[in-house]
Swiss-Prot record:
GO terms for cellular component: cytoplasm. Belongs to the UPF0294 family. InterPro entries: Endo/exonu/phosph_ase_sf, Endo/exonuclease/phosphatase, UPF0294. The keyword Methyltransferase does not apply. Keywords: Cytoplasm. It comes from Vibrio campbellii (strain ATCC BAA-1116). It is found in: Cytoplasm. NCBIfam families: PRK05421.1-2 (NF003840), PRK05421.1-3 (NF003841), PRK05421.1-4 (NF003842). HAMAP family: UPF0294 (MF_01119). The lineage of its organism: Bacteria, Pseudomonadati, Pseudomonadota, Gammaproteobacteria, Vibrionales. Disulfide bonds: none annotated. One of its GO terms (molecular function) is catalytic activity. Its main location: cytoplasm. This is UPF0294 protein VIBHAR_03217.
Amino acid sequence: MYQRLAFALVFLIIAGFVSFQVIFTVPEQPQIITQTGTNITQDIRCMEFKQPQVLDKDGELNVLVWNIYKQNRDNWQQALDAFSANKQLLLLQEASLTDEFKNWLVDGHWVSNQVSAFKALGSGAGVISIAQKEPIRACAYTSKEPWLRLPKSALYSKYQLSNGETLAVVNIHAINFTVGTEEYTSQLSVLEKVLKEHKGPILFAGDFNSWSEERLTAMKKALQKANLQEVTFSQDNRTQFITGLPLDHVFYRGLTLKNAKAPQSDASDHNPLLVSFTLNDQ
């Protein structure tokens, strides 16, 4: 009997491993996928752009931050159409680069940069930063979940602004399944050190998976080192963990916050964040 149980256990472990390898493909190095119209290019780590253009519109910058839940809900496209209207920058997490999503990008004349953290059944998955204009530079960062071994991702981009400054943008999906905050803090620290080299305005946003007080403290401590302040929402329906703590955040510096709200939506398991800034005079 014990021999049969042992055999069954080994079989389940092998079957699980094989299934994982079939479903998920994890690149050895962080990869970035850029789509401009129907043209798609891929590179390791970073992508440079020869003709970056001004991101803001007449000194205003309207941003959508949203974990889109791999577009698993039937109404994701209708909701994304509505939330992305009049936005210059979309910072999405858990985006799956399916054919349907690629077509949405083409139809909206968007320029996108995605971290291909892993592929699930052939479709790239990871954070994606989307704008009407090309950035100056975009770089991919990944950090593996210590238990699941699937990477979480972050994208660091730099955009030209109309006041002559350069905006640094970090789009993050933070590590989730850990005991303690060591891996969580390490992921944030790498990005915080990159931002230390940037002298201009910064936007740091995404799904921080800040479901515990320890994580919340680690997050705020890391971002305070870059002199960032947190956006407060006048309409705050941000998705919360069972602890009552919000998972999604927006931090910034060198910009003037105009308004911020987090409306409810059934198009994902996270509610979207809609934030508007104005540029500072130079």
